């Protein structure tokens, strides 16, 4: 298995665009609040790791302005072409295997990335090494084991099916080397990496139209793998997608834990 094989959800499939749109709706307000908190402004140099779609990169580009720089990296940059112009530089890069794409960054940020990277220890070291002294690291990652249910209010057969399929999704992720308890470890890992003033918080939506869109796109994207692994039948998946489409189920997400610290 190569490091990039660790990622289950291919960015080139149509559903990836739907998923990135849902992440933006669900998590951008939280991410932008944290980025503002750690400090991003004109002239800053930022590395956006595992950028995926364009919303965070575009926001960072507006904050740093023409005098700044945003290096946006991903193992698959196919969704980033629209923002690949100064101050944004887009590079294909595996954060678990490649050298950092520069050094002396004021800010390094990754959202919902390291949980998927088999060598996340190396990835974290690389991100810290790319900071200037005084630079800020912000890592936001899921902790699906902390809140494993897509339907926390499991009150009927629709919700039970949804939670069973979610369990299958988690198994596929874990089999690919994802650490499903990663989010909670971030404060300790940041301190162990030598960062100062480490703090963290968590956020998850309990229901939202974007959760519905995310669930539909995710299940359509992994349906073949769920069936091949014997974790669900095509009938299960059709029934679940129809339930999701019908509305009325309160679909949540795993908590996203945001942790930040300063390089001494
Ligand atoms: C769940 S998506 C999150 C995308 C984006 N950060 C967001 O929050 O909307 C995970 C992203 O990490 C990327 N990724 C997975 N493994 C990676 C690795 N080893 N190095 C760099 N990027 C990786 C994927 O290609 C994908 O774009």
Language model features by range: what are they?
Residues 3-28:
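Class I SAM-dependent methyltransferase Rossmann-like catalytic core
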Residues 25-45, 59:
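Conserved alpha-helix/loop element of class I SAM-dependent methyltransferases that forms part
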Residues 47, 51-99:
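Class I SAM-dependent methyltransferase SAM/SAH-binding core
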Residues 99-108:
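A short acidic, Gly/Pro-enriched loop at the edge of an enzyme's catalytic core
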Residues 110-115, 140:
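Residues lining the SAM
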Residues 121-136:
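A short glycine-rich, Lys/Arg-flanked "PGG" loop and its adjoining helix->strand segment in the class I
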Residues 138-210, 231:
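Conserved catalytic/acceptor-binding region of the Class I
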Residues 179-184, 197-264:
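Conserved Class I S-adenosyl-L-methionine
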């Amino acid at each position: 298995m190569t490091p990039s094989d660790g990622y289950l959800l291919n960015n080139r499939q149509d559903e990836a665009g739907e998923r990135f749109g849902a992440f933006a709706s669900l998590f951008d307000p939280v991410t932008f609040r944290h980025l503002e908190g750690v400090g991003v402004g004109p002239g800053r140099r930022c590395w956006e790791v595992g950028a995926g779609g364009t919303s965070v990169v575009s926001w960072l580009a507006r904050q740093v302005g023409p005098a700044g720089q945003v290096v946006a990296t991903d193992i698959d940059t196919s969704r980033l072409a629209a923002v690949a112009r100064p101050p944004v530089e887009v590079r294909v890069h595996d954060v678990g295997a490649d050298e950092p794409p520069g050094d002396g960054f004021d800010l390094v940020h990754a959202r919902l990335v390291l949980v998927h990277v088999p060598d996340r220890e190396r990835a974290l070291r690389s991100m810290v090494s790319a900071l200037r002294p005084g630079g800020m690291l912000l890592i936001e990652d899921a902790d699906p084991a902390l809140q494993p249910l897509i339907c926390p209010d499991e009150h009927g057969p629709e919700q039970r099916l949804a939670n069973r399929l979610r369990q299958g999704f988690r198994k596929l992720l874990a089999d690919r080397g994802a650490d499903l308890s990663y989010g909670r470890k971030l404060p300790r890992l940041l301190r162990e990496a030598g960062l100062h003033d480490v703090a963290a918080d968590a956020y998850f939506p309990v229901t939202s139209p974007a959760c519905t869109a995310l669930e539909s796109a995710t299940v359509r994207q992994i349906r073949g793998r769920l069936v091949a692994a014997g974790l669900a039948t095509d009938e299960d998946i059709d029934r679940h997608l129809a339930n999701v489409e019908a509305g009325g189920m309160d679909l949540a997400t795993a908590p996203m834990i945001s942790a930040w610290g300063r390089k001494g």
